[in-house]
Amino acid sequence: MSTNAIAKRYAKALVQLGSEAGTVDSFNTELDRFSALLTESRDLSAVFANPAYGIESKREVMKELVAKLQLSPMISNLLMLLLERGRISVLPEISQSYGAFADELSGVIRPTLSSGLPLEAGQIEEIRSALAKSTGKKVELKVEVDPSLIGGVVTKIGGKVFDGSVRTQLARIQDILQKG
């Protein structure tokens, strides 16, 4: 089974438990914090991945981290389970999948809006409103400036890309001229 499939199973189960307990958002925050710690600290990741360290040593390290980060018992149990099963390295993917499932549950989408030039607040709000109206969901828009676009905007929602950039329009014109 792929690590992505494994991550989705753990994430989905945790979202269901969080939904029942009303702790979806706090679980998301805790997963993100611990996942960031694993990603940023190569030494910590190396300890958990190294078979030379026994499971008891790894448990002690995990207990200290859980206490220091003040993680909930549910997240603590998940981390211990992942550690026992040798799957702690999958945590960043679990965290990412959890965030996606939590957003789906709460009716949130997180599109990325890239523009060739900085956009004004009014323009951003207009785009956010249009996306909310067309999707029927709450929109958490991430705005980026990409000078290579020359002008226009590119919006990415999940796996879909809506490209209204000048760069793409110029590329299309070039293709037409070369073929014609």
Curated annotation (Swiss-Prot):
NCBIfam families: ATP_synt_delta. F-type ATPases have 2 components, F(1) - the catalytic core - and F(0) - the membrane proton channel. F(1) has five subunits: alpha(3), beta(3), gamma(1), delta(1), epsilon(1). F(0) has three main subunits: a(1), b(2) and c(10-14). The alpha and beta chains form an alternating ring which encloses part of the gamma chain. F(1) is attached to F(0) by a central stalk formed by the gamma and epsilon chains, while a peripheral stalk is formed by the delta and b chains. SUPFAM superfamilies: N-terminal domain of the delta subunit of the F1F0-ATP synthase. It holds the Pfam family OSCP. It is found in: Cell inner membrane. This is ATP synthase subunit delta. The keyword Chloroplast does not apply. GO terms for cellular component: plasma membrane; proton-transporting ATP synthase complex. It is a peripheral membrane protein. Keywords: ATP synthesis, Cell inner membrane, Cell membrane, CF(1), Hydrogen ion transport, Ion transport, Membrane, Transport. The gene is atpH. Disulfide bonds: none annotated. PANTHER family: ATP SYNTHASE DELTA CHAIN. Its main location: membrane. The keyword Transport applies. F(1)F(0) ATP synthase produces ATP from ADP in the presence of a proton or sodium gradient. F-type ATPases consist of two structural domains, F(1) containing the extramembraneous catalytic core and F(0) containing the membrane proton channel, linked together by a central stalk and a peripheral stalk. During catalysis, ATP synthesis in the catalytic domain of F(1) is coupled via a rotary mechanism of the central stalk subunits to proton translocation. This protein is part of the stalk that links CF(0) to CF(1). It either transmits conformational changes from CF(0) to CF(1) or is implicated in proton conduction. One of its GO terms (molecular function) is proton-transporting ATP synthase activity, rotational mechanism.
